[in-house]
Amino acid sequence: MYKVLSLIILFSLITKNAVSESKFYIIAKVNNEIITNYDVETESNYLKLLNPNLNQLDENKIIEIAKNSLINEVIKKKQLKKIFNFEQNQPVINKIFNDFYTNLGFLNEKDFKQVLKSKKSYTVLEIKEKIKIDFLWNKLIYNLHNKQIKIDKKKTFKQNQK
């Protein structure tokens, strides 16, 4: 009797895992990095947290935006790793992160973490990684193009006085 019960339990666990594994599927493959439907759903929840107006869009449109966001992130990260020491700790990221959740209306990191968990979004570490990618990408673009930008300080000063 014990063996039969054990086999039934084992079989049910195996089939349950097999069924639950089929819930995840590949949406895209970018630079040998796989993006799954779970990744897109998490990104979608994150984007909705950043911009609640996204909730007014059709769900398929939100999914498309999230997928494109993830694809862009993978491409940016690959390029950034060629130029920057990506693993190096950057203290400015913590400052940007604090400003980030404060601008979203959260009083502290703990409240922000709770909402992230309830919305099935990213962890704080994952968000800091996203912030690092954006920060380094903006830094790269600035470094590449800052010499091309010319600001007429006299004209700007006159416009600010009006």
Task: Report the location of each language-model feature.
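Peptidyl-prolyl cis-trans isomerase
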Residues: L57-K162
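Short, low-structural-confidence N-terminal segments
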Residues: M1-N68, S118, Y142, K162
